[in-house]
Swiss-Prot record:
Residues 104-191 are annotated as: Disordered. The chain crosses the membrane at residues 1121-1141. Residues 212-313, 317-409, 413-506, 510-604, 608-701, 705-795, 805-894, 895-989, 990-1095 form the Fibronectin type-III domain. Residues 107-145 have a biased composition (Basic and acidic residues). Mediates spermatid-Sertoli adhesion during spermatogenesis. It comes from the Eukaryota. It is a single-pass membrane protein. This is Fibronectin type-III domain-containing protein 3A. The lineage of its organism: Eukaryota, Metazoa, Chordata, Craniata, Vertebrata.
Amino acid sequence: MSGPAQVPMMSPNGSVPPIYVPPGYAPQVIEDNGVRRVVVVPQAPEFHPGGHTVLHRSPHPPLPGFIPVPTMMPPPPRHMYSPVTGAGDMTTQYMPQYQSSQVYGDVDAHSTHGRSNFRDERSSKTYERLQKKLKDRQGTQKDKMSSPPSSPQKCPSPINEHNGLIKGQNAGGINTGSAKIKSGKGKGGTQVDTEIEEKDEETKAFEALLSNIVKPVASDIQARTVVLTWSPPSSLINGETDESSVPELYGYEVLISSTGKDGKYKSVYIGEETNITLNDLKPATDYHAKVQAEYNSIKGTPSEAEIFTTLSCEPDIPNPPRIANRTKNSLTLQWKAPSDNGSKIQNFVLEWDEGKGNGEFYQCYMGSQKQFKITKLSPAMGCKFRLSARNDYGTSGFSEEVLYYTSGCAPSMPASPVLTKAGITWLSLQWSKPSGTPSDEGISYILEMEEETSGYGFKPKYDGEDLAYTVKNLRRSTKYKFKVIAYNSEGKSNPSEVVEFTTCPDKPGIPVKPSVKGKIHSHSFKITWDPPKDNGGAAINKYVVEMAEGSNGNKWEMIYSGATREHLCDRLNPGCFYRLRVYCISDGGQSAVSESLLVQTPAVPPGPCLPPRLQGRPKAKEIQLRWGPPLVDGGSPISCYSVEMSPIEKDEPREVYQGSEVECTVSSLLPGKTYSFRLRAANKMGFGPFSEKCDITTAPGPPDQCKPPQVTCRSATCAQVNWEVPLSNGTDVTEYRLEWGGVEGSMQICYCGPGLNYEIKGLSPATTYYCRVQALSVVGAGPFSEVVACVTPPSVPGIVTCLQEISDDEIENPHYSPSTCLAISWEKPCDHGSEILAYSIDSGDKQSLTVGKVTSYIINNLQPDTTYRIRIQALNSLGAGPFSHVIKLKTKPLPPDPPRLECVAFSHQNLKLKWGEGTPKTLSTDSIQYHLQMEDKNGRFVSLYRGPCHTYKVQRLNESTSYKFCIQACNEAGEGPVSQEYIFTTPKSVPAALKAPKIEKVNDHICEITWECLQPMKGDPVIYSLQVMLGKDSEFKQIYKGPDSSFRYSSLQLNCEYRFRVCAIRQCQDSLGHQDLVGPYSTTVLFISQRTEPPASTNRDTVESTRTRRALSDEQCAAVNLVLFAFFSILIAFIIQYFVIK
């Protein structure tokens, strides 16, 4: 490649896809008229102007699928980043590094394979600086991570960003031209480069933190499920950790592969949990699982792979059997084996319904073959079949049921099809089975159709087993001929007789919008219309005209129905809007309605109104009139009303109201005088005639306003109110209304009668009250008096409410004991004008307890497990208030004492502890709970167990080590005291069992025995003990004891059986002296000594070889043991299945 080369690229999301660039070349992204081109040009040589930053190339070759673009690239916004899916794609591992904010930085090609050991001194310092900055930016970190960092203020060339890639025509020349453009601004440019490089190092350090994650742990492995658990990335750097700078919540992505450790991985989980359950796995399959950490769009390197294998299970459900051959009396079926799921399929089970069709299946074949022939069947007989497979783990489910028929005879000629329903473009036909056909025989039908005018003859329209079919896409009002043919696997029948059916005509088209013919009058006008362009294939029978009153009226009424195309609309109202529309009817149906025509008749002046009427009762100085609109508005809305008034004794009318309202108030009248009123209405055409006159007489006036009442408080709950008689205005006062209340604007009537005083009881002490009075006569009610305020004197406090017990969790008093104390709280009652000084608590004792101005108190010196009745009252300077309601509280019993702790079983790694009296498995509902603790390396006691059981097994201990334990009992009364410290010591472990020794014959009387050698156990030497048992002896004898791993036995006798075994002995030296810990013996090896003779003939060699083979090797012994173990396991499983489960 000698010069630039253009590479056309297509991307579905608008971003530039990754490409591979040869060494020595660099890509440039150029945009021209909205089209991006990637130009590959030779890499420009490095340019080092004085005082400027040098752009270095990466010392490593480009990674596959990675674009070595210029490093001056801002990071993409967080909302535009999307992680690449696909488990095995290389871009998934390297894309987070490519999209991080690497400005003037090198690409680290080793970051995807390292762990915490790969960091150098510079990365460690950068990580410490990152931890410091994360603390300072803890409040605004999410806002900063969601937006791209700001560009330097003195950037020489415009660079646009699109999905993390550089966009612009000048983007390709950054490496070669940036030094010249920044000439004269070296100081500012160097500062910006340092800040961006620092951000790049922080990102790398954070990626290193996310990469420090261990592989997941697989547990609860089943045939199709597994549980994966992992821990967050470790924050340990150079032996130190800072938990304050580590994020509280990570994101994780779990990748699995079933094609090997280096196979293709796929993503199965993305979230924030640290344990998941994987479902839908393949049984008996090896899987590799990895986990990858992510935080704020930065991903770490995936962990090492965890390898696990799913369990085996019963086979998958097989596919239905398929038919291989059929005759009139037999069916031959074949099938394929499904997945065996880790265990070889032993048998296939084929069931059938014997052709009865009642849903009951019977076994017809069971074996390892994959085909079977069913014989002795009847012609045209239908049978259902299903198949299952069986292996060592069980039987699979049955396959789908399939129905197969034996061969039969061709059907007879069917009857002609019958028309069930006809439409405009379709015809529904129905036919029946040929006569003499069995009901269960599978017969198909061919429906053929011929159009009268097409000239193509009959063509098939349907081929299937149904007895009905709807032929669609036909023409309206057209005749069609039909016939039906029946067939089966044996042949076709003769066609049925031809029948002819006709489709229905279509409804006609929309008529033309009607129009007005002639002049529009106030009460009538004439309309006309044209017929529709499409009559639907049939003549128009009649037209229907509908009319709706109003410009937006939707209540249509039929006003005409006939064959003519014009109509006179009469008996209309003046000035009204009318909407008219028309539709037509033919044999094909009714057409849609036409567009509506809007017509308005001319208006006239309104008609006379009814006389105005009195609204309510007449008052002394004013009356209120009300009227309705005229019966005839003249076709135009009423815009104005005019009311005239004149005294009854003289005819001098004057206008007292003109407006659009339908009521008015006439004031400045004289009480007890008669007046005449008349009314007229007007619209846009003018005023109409006056109505008839209406005579109305004014009424006498109500009493005047009362003077303010006088209030006298007789006690804290009683007050006396007095008032005077006001002016009556010509009528006597019949009664007075007194309003009383605690709020000035919300008073209620408390008295209504003729009296001039009233006594009010049931008041609250030290409370402000308001009152006013009103006089009434037969005429009406006068205005209320002015409001008067009064204050009642103070009294004893009110009753105490909300008396309740305080829970133990809310008490912070260190001297509180739930067995001898009760804590209560209450709400402060109303003091009734005098401050509350104390409270008196009555708990049933002879003397009550008085406390200060508090709302909670702890009652001490009580008896454990005792019920008390408690009530309380408040006290002030005026006396004691009433007692509150009584509550029953009970003290708790005393906490239990700790039990004695014992060690009932021990080994070099386990200690089984027991305490108290009870069964090992105690129910969780026991009232007493136990808390077992053990001392750790720092001398602190940590919790081992908390629960109701009386035993606990401590595991994963060190041999020959002393451990300290203590125990504590607790119940609903609280936690009891901690017991004394108990010290238990684990013994030393014995050596492991050795493999069976190997025996080599030296001569007729000497053989050499060798065995495996063990390493010293924690500094203790290991020796070996070799034993032999001769012939039919019942006991072994020791022939060697020492540190060697071989021994020559020289006391062999000819034609004798020898059994050898060996064990390891650990020699311990402790404070008690020398001690030997003997391990288990190895497997016994049989050896038969025989005389060695020269070969005489072929037969003799064969006999000698047979005798020599009697000594079993290690592999043969292991095979024999495995077979015996499998036999006994199957036998025990069968016994449990038969006697226990059934």
